[in-house]
Design a protein with these regions (language model features):
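Phosphate/dinucleotide-binding and metal-coordinating scaffold of catalytic cores
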Residues: 1-215
């Protein structure tokens, strides 16, 4: 009586089943299980071992009506999400408007470019190999590179972005990996536009205040 049946559904040319991995703080990968796309927009997650944090309550059987919540958390969002979408949308055949993305678009993005998304989960063998390779040879900036590289990274982050349209007061930002004698450290760098307008100057002043308050 507890048996349930569903048809697998291919997503683009990526197939319908993919391994899910977790990468720990030491850069080691662990296979957590397998995610399958189902006909009708649902998904099934088959764990390699019991994972109560993922499968509980209505989802104890591993069946989800949409993208499982633990992967939906990696859905692109905010300023950085829109920057990510502009970079990958054409390649995966997804809309360039983030608000039009569906679960299939998120899955394709995670499979091809999900090696550096928030959290410790990586979907698919391709993304895992990219994540492991990035950990072996990180593109880190030294202190004396920041003055020249930060403006270029800010310009790249703003490419195609109307800075005045950021919803919810989102502050333009980019991510970087910084190298020092103590090792490497991930950073989120906020910035203001170059225009020199009163609004831009206010943002710059607020960022300085935020930096001082955080010291």
């Amino acid at each position: 009586r507890s048996s349930r049946y569903a048809l697998a559904q291919d997503i683009g040319r990526a197939g319908s089943r993919w391994p899910l991995y977790r990468i720990d703080s030491l850069g080691r990968s662990e296979a957590l299980g397998e995610l399958s796309a189902l006909h009708g927009g649902g998904f099934h997650f088959a764990p390699a071992r019991p994972i109560p944090a993922f499968l509980h309550g209505d989802f104890a059987a591993g069946v989800f009506p949409g993208l499982p919540w633990f992967l939906d958390d990696q859905r692109p969002q905010g300023f950085l999400g829109r920057t990510f979408v502009r970079r990958v949308a054409t390649d995966i055949g997804a809309p360039e408007d983030l608000t039009r993305w569906q679960a299939d678009d998120v899955v394709l993005a995670l499979l091809r470019y999900g090696e550096d998304e928030p959290g410790d989960l990586v979907l698919g063998e391709h993304a895992l190999q990219r994540a492991l390779q990035a950990a072996l040879s990180p593109e880190a900036l030294s202190a004396n590179q920041r003055e020249t590289r930060y403006p270029a990274l800010a310009d790249a982050a703003l490419a195609g972005e109307d800075i005045g349209s950021s919803a919810g007061g989102e502050q333009p930002k980019f991510t970087a990996l910084l190298r020092s004698d103590a090792g490497t450290q991930a950073a989120i760098v906020k910035f203001s536009e170059r225009s020199g307008t009163p609004a831009a100057q206010r943002w710059a002043d607020l960022l300085r205040c935020e930096h001082i308050a955080g010291q």
